[in-house]
UniProtKB/Swiss-Prot annotation:
Family note: Belongs to the peptidase S9B family.
Protein name: Probable dipeptidyl-aminopeptidase B
Any Pfam family the entry gives: Peptidase_S9
GO terms classed as biological process: proteolysis
Functional summary from the UniProt entry: Type IV dipeptidyl-peptidase which removes N-terminal dipeptides sequentially from polypeptides having unsubstituted N-termini provided that the penultimate residue is proline.
Subcellular location: Vacuole membrane
Cytoplasmic compartment residues: 1-88
Biased composition (Low complexity): 22-36
Bias kind Basic and acidic residues: ranges: 1-11
Gene designation: DAPB
Organism: Tuber melanosporum (strain Mel28) (Perigord black truffle)
UniProt region (Disordered), positions on chain: 1-71
Length: 907
């Protein structure tokens, strides 16, 4: 139905090894191939009769007589004799070629090191020419190919007027534990904590993390970290006095207390913390008779079902991507915090068969039973946690709520962002449960009132949704600089693309448009220079698969690139507090690097190298790396980006197997011009398979029209785009269209199964799905309903998105399913439900591997290495045709007896 698809292949290549003008140092692969051709000519009747690697696995693949593949007879018994002189000449030539091959091999082996190119990485080359070491899976798994990056935390000086200060934390034995560096002058370094091995309350304290107060006189220190969920943890907290070099517990009355969160006030005179799901505040420097009374308990009814100041599981995973749900006002006089009531949220049991994450010993007689952890997990359509915003007035010592006019009902409200102004106002971003109606709420904490100042129904505009955003930037009033009113910068939709809008005053619903065009801003804005009225941001203006830094004035004028767009590049950036400096991270396509640079807001001539990744460059120079070829495919009018990873010494005359790697989640992106030697690169370079990734409809940065097309019917268009792209690749002369596979993890696992189901064996022969969603009714409500609505509003869509067509799955040659038993994100229930469907339908063309006590990342007890070992070995078996032999298996006796009978007849 979809065989004829328009295709635009720019064949833009980004290889990992520089081209060499000479072929004299090529791998012995080419010579071996030449020798094999000569020997094959001596014993071949028809050049086209020799089967390829895949076809040789069985006579049914070619329709030839059974004798063609008989291991004891072979075709040689029926070949015609050659003329004697010709045969002698051919043998002589063959022996000369073999001798030359052995001589070349001896020279190659005797060399002290592998041939290397002139540079480690040349994005302009199109093929690997020189020989080098092979990439190994061990290298990839231990992180040898990961670039080094340094996360810099920019901070203000003690008085807030010093720019270019950064906070650096080092590992034990690697310099000062915590220090403040001046990027302009290394001699101005301020050592906050010299050694992370501290003493507190007469006991040793091993610091794992430190946060200085704004005046740099004290440091909040965490120790004894215990992981909770993906982003959260419990720890013991301490206050370190920099001048006195003393350490005291944050909670004086409970030095052993484990807290879920602790954070400084902006002025450094108080710390808010969460213990047992309640909010507390410790005020410092008070003239009190007892340190104990400096701690105020703000809330008192927190417990297993009621959270204050920290998110529950679903808000941590899908909204805040962190462990904090409290926000200090900029003057430190108010504290806003989230109240989360999950009383009505159903529980899901997580089973641990090997370990006991709770740390508790089981009761006598129950040692052999698994440990159960019950998590409040709202699945699609189930009751959500009910959230409210509450406030604490530190001067009046009052805890209060604010009534918002025209607010969402409790069961239809998501609070996704809170931003304080300079004064007593704050902005609250809310959406309805299905994330397609946005309301920006302005709250006056002095008047204790709130109102909706902006409402957008995106479902009426393009049928799409709002993603969770945490990049709203408050802009204070400054009449002298042309800003008479307060305002904020937010992402807005303009002509089908995400852009920046400046809303001023705070209650204005019509923005000043700062950017526009058929491209999108990314997590913007990155910084705002208030003194000069400059907004900095990252965007895709040059290409959806690149990232460059740009700037624009607050009035929308003077749009310009900050990084050079004359060359391909993917950049990330973080700015100093006054925007005069930036940590610029170049992620590829060449060897990544990091520099601190001066910005247009400061001294643009300033450059300081932070990381050159010289070790990675040396490693790349010694290895044969795949080449990366970027192109687009046009499917149903959408230009979709593709990256093809080709093996070193790619030969277009060969027939290569192809592996498609997929994620495909809404708003995601896999195809990008970044340096990445990962599992996919290993498959291409180490196993010499082609690996293709295509970002289909639903993915990000190609406009909302392509993105929102998947709403309400996840999997259909995404799988369609994978299949159509695979058909295009199957027509390429260097691709073996009978050996095409697909694999993915999480949403990519769902995409793998959905693609196999929709394709029904016509294009993809194999698939490997790790931790897949198989029924969206099993996944969490906030994520799922954003893209699918609720099951109550979209029953047919949920049925269509479920992996349920077992007969279609049975038409692929074989697929692999893997899952962590203790997955708290994509529950094992997904894979078990699919296995039950396969059992009922008597479908058996699959393999399964489960990992006890592993969560969604699958790490417990060497599990992560096992995942990739299994993927590699299973893929080799698939492309070697081994799974084709599993169909119609017979006992060895039934096979060997006809062979013996036939051999007797030939004697």
């Amino acid at each position: 139905m979809y065989d004829q698809v328009p295709y635009r292949d720019t064949d833009e290549a980004t290889p990992q090894i520089k081209n060499d003008a000479s072929d004299s140092n090529r791998s012995s692969i080419d010579t071996t191939s030449t020798t094999s051709l000569i020997l094959e000519r001596l014993h071949r009747e028809d050049p086209d009769d020799s089967p390829g690697e895949y076809e040789s696995s069985g006579p049914s693949q070619r329709g030839k007589p059974d004798e063609d593949d008989d291991l004891e007879i072979g075709r040689a018994a029926r070949l015609k004799p050659m003329e004697r002189k010709v045969r002698r000449a051919m043998y002589l030539l063959a022996f000369l070629m073999i001798g030359g091959w052995f001589l070349a091999l001896a020279v190659y082996v005797s060399r002290e090191h592998f041939g290397t190119p002139d540079t480690a990485h040349d994005p302009s080359a199109t093929a690997t020419r020189k020989a080098g070491k092979k990439i190994t899976l061990n290298q990839v798994m231990r992180g040898a190919w990961r670039s080094k990056t340094h996360g810099i935390q920019w901070i203000n000086g003690p008085h807030g007027d010093q720019d270019g200060l950064l906070l650096t934390q080092n590992s034990f034995g690697d310099g000062n534990f915590l220090e403040v560096q001046d990027v302009k002058n290394d001699s101005n370094t301020i050592v906050l904590i010299k050694d992370g091995a501290l003493q507190g309350s007469g006991q040793p304290v091993s610091a794992i993390k430190g946060w200085p107060s704004s005046d740099l006189k004290k440091v909040l220190v965490a120790s004894d970290h215990e992981k909770r969920w993906r982003h959260s943890y419990n720890a013991r907290y301490w206050i370190y006095d920099v001048e006195k070099a003393t350490t005291e517990p944050l909670v004086p009355s409970e030095p052993e207390a484990r807290l879920s969160l602790a954070t400084w006030s902006p002025k450094g005179d108080a710390i808010a913390f969460v213990k047992d799901n309640n909010v507390f505040i410790r005020q410092l420097g008070l003239d009190l008779t007892s340190e104990y009374y400096s701690v105020t308990q703000v809330t008192k009814d927190g417990g297993p079902d009621l959270f204050y100041g920290i998110p529950d599981w679903v808000y941590e995973e899908e909204v805040f991507s962190g462990n904090s749900a409290l926000w200090w006002s900029q003057d430190g006089e108010f504290l806003a915090f989230l109240r989360t009531n999950e009383t009505e949220v159903p529980e899901y049991p997580i089973q641990y068969f090997v370990s006991r994450p709770s740390g508790n010993n089981p009761p006598n007689g129950l040692e052999n039973y698994p440990e159960l952890e019950f998590i409040k997990y709202p699945k699609a359509g189930a009751p959500n946690p009910v959230v409210h915003l509450r406030f604490y007035d530190l001067k009046k010592k009052e805890d209060f709520a604010v009534t918002v006019e025209n607010d969402f009902p409790d069961d239809d409200r998501l609070i996704t962002e809170v931003v304080w102004s300079d004064g007593k106002y704050l902005l609250v971003r809310e959406t309805n449960r299905e994330s397609d109606v946005l309301r920006m709420v302005l709250i006056d904490v002095s008047a204790r009132s709130g109102k909706v100042v902006r409402e957008v129904d995106i479902s009426a505009i393009d049928g799409g949704w709002f993603e969770v955003s945490k990049n709203t930037r408050y802009i204070p009033a400054d009449p002298a600089s042309g800003r008479p009113y307060e305002g904020y910068i937010d992402t807005v939709i303009h002509e089908g693309y995400d852009h920046l809008g400046y809303f001023t005053p705070l209650d204005n619903k019509d923005p000043i448009l700062l950017t526009k065009g058929q491209w999108e801003v990314v997590d913007a804005p990155s910084a705002v220079d208030l003194k000069n009225g400059i907004v900095y941001f990252v965007a895709t203006e040059k290409s959806p698969i690149e990232r460059h830094v740009y700037s624009v004035k607050l009035d929308g004028s003077n749009f310009r690139p900050v990084t050079s767009t004359s060359e391909d590049g993917r950049y990330d950036v973080s700015f100093s507090k006054l925007s005069g400096y930036a940590l610029l991270t170049y992620e590829g396509p060449g060897i990544p690097w990091q520099k601190v640079v001066g910005t247009p807001s400061g001294d643009q001539s300033f450059v300081k190298d932070i990381e050159k990744n010289q070790g990675l460059a040396t490693l790349a120079a010694k290895h044969e790396l795949p080449t990366f070829h970027y192109s687009t495919v046009n499917i149903d009018g959408f230009d979709l980006h593709v990256v093809e990873r080709r093996p070193p010494h790619f030969n277009k005359k060969r027939k290569y197997p192809v592996l498609f790697q997929v994620y495909g989640g809404p708003g995601s992106q896999q195809v990008s011009k970044s340096f990445s030697i990962d599992f996919q690169a290993y498959i291409a370079a180490g196993l010499e398979y082609i690996v293709v990734t295509v970002d289909g409809r639903g993915t990000g940065f190609i406009g909302r029209k392509a993105r929102v097309a998947v709403r309400g019917n996840l999997g259909y268009w995404e799988a369609h785009d994978q299949i159509e792209t695979a058909k295009i690749w199957g027509k390429k002369g260097y691709v073996d269209k009978k050996r095409i596979a697909i694999w993915g993890w999480s949403y990519g696992g769902f995409m793998t199964l959905k693609t196999l189901e929709q394709d029904a064996g016509r294009t993809f022969s194999y698939g490997m799905a790790v931790a897949p969603v198989t029924d969206w009714r099993f996944y969490d409500s906030i994520y799922t309903e954003r893209y699918m609505h609720t099951p109550q509003h979209n029953q047919e869509g949920y049925r269509n998105a479920t992996i349920s067509d077992t007969q279609a799955l049975s038409k692929s040659v074989r697929f692999l399913l893997m899952h962590g038993v203790a997955d708290d994100n994509v529950h094992m229930q997904n894979s078990l439900a699919l296995l039950d469907k396969l059992d009922l339908a008597s479908v058996e063309n699959y393999d399964v591997h489960v990992f006890p006590d592993s969560d969604h990342s699958i790490y417990f007890h060497n599990a992560n290495r096992m995942v990739y070992d299994r993927l590699e070995q299973w893929l080799i078996r698939a492309f070697n045709g081994e799974f084709l032999k599993l169909d119609g298996l017979k006992p060895i006796r039934e096979i060997s007896e006809p062979l013996r009978k036939r051999n007797r007849e030939l004697v």
